[in-house]
Amino acid sequence: WGALFNTALKINNTQKIGLQATYSTNTDNIISDRSGYDFEQTRKISSTAIEYTENHLLTTRLYGEHQLTPKGIRLSWGGGVNQTSRNVPSLRRMFYFKNFDDTTDVTIPFQAYVPFGSADPYRSGRFYSNLEENIYNGNADLTIPFFLGTQKQSVKIGGLYQKRDRKFDARVM
């Protein structure tokens, strides 16, 4: 789901200020059950994965447009904050295998793959992660009109600032 907000105030014919905001969130809840044959390792495999992910996005922008002189010198400015987050509270995977020689005998169960020494998030294990990112930005532009002969021209001078903070935490078990 999401939300959108947009408003502007025209103070007079030469001054305008506005605010824009957008919010969006979505989630994924995925359960995968796979089975097949690994011919290289001569075994039958089966795996299960359960994953829940949530994503959030917020963008905001405050802006203004101002005509500073009767000759048309204009100032445009803007500033905003964007926030993004992604959370995987628990991704669980389990991997099972059975040798080709044992596939016809139903009394021989599949064996669970349990990593030795360090965690393996691709076969069996758990994965947790959290990503948060904030972006701060601002800009200003000055437009100066002039005539070159009889042709109306303009020159624009401006700048942009952007700062990004990102925090990512992950854990594999």
Which role does the model predict for each range below?
Residues 1-5, 56-62, 79, 134-140:
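Hydrophobic, lipid-facing positions within transmembrane beta-strands of outer-membrane proteins
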Residues 1-30, 58-60:
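Transmembrane beta-barrel wall of Gram-negative outer-membrane proteins
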Residues 5-11, 66-68, 144-146:
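Residue-level signature of outer-membrane beta-barrel architecture
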Residues 13-14, 69-74, 146-154, 170:
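Short loop/turn motifs that connect adjacent beta-strands in outer-membrane beta-barrel proteins
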Residues 18-39, 43, 84-97, 164-173:
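Outer-membrane beta-barrel and related beta-rich outer-membrane complex signature
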Residues 23-27, 68, 81-87, 130, ...:
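Transmembrane beta-strands of outer-membrane beta-barrel pores
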Residues 35-46, 111-124:
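Flexible, solvent-exposed coil segments and beta strand-coil junctions
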Residues 45-51, 63, 124-129:
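Extracellular loop and loop/strand-boundary signature of outer-membrane beta-barrel proteins
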